[in-house]
Amino acid sequence: MGTSTAKEAHALIASLRSAYSATPTKLKIIDLYVVYAILTAVVQVVYMAIVGSFPFNAFLSGVLSCTGTAVLAVCLRMQVNKENREFKDLPPERAFADFVLCNLVLHLVIMNFLG
């Protein structure tokens, strides 16, 4: 029972890897940025758990900035992906401009929250 499950898991990972290898480089860069933003948020949470959260608004601002940026990057990835039929009429330049504008608004709110 356990070996068939392990084989299925290995086959699943192999199929995911082969499908992801066909992904365009632009999307892989966005994926890398999303992973970086999430890992930065995780590092901040671990640091808060170990050291403490004395300036809690600073901790909250950092985590919300990281997760908000990751969410906006996922939205950018959805809009730039050529296989996504929902945004096929949207030019990539417009999607990137939306991403930059939303990031600007997000970080203005974060800076306002910091005080």
Curated annotation (Swiss-Prot):
One of its GO terms (biological process) is protein N-linked glycosylation. Pfam families: DAD. GO terms for cellular component: oligosaccharyltransferase complex. Residues 53-55 are lumenal. It is a multi-pass membrane protein. Component of the oligosaccharyltransferase (OST) complex. Subunit of the oligosaccharyl transferase (OST) complex that catalyzes the initial transfer of a defined glycan (Glc(3)Man(9)GlcNAc(2) in eukaryotes) from the lipid carrier dolichol-pyrophosphate to an asparagine residue within an Asn-X-Ser/Thr consensus motif in nascent polypeptide chains, the first step in protein N-glycosylation. N-glycosylation occurs cotranslationally and the complex associates with the Sec61 complex at the channel-forming translocon complex that mediates protein translocation across the endoplasmic reticulum (ER). All subunits are required for a maximal enzyme activity. This is Dolichyl-diphosphooligosaccharide--protein glycosyltransferase subunit DAD1. It comes from Picea mariana (Black spruce).
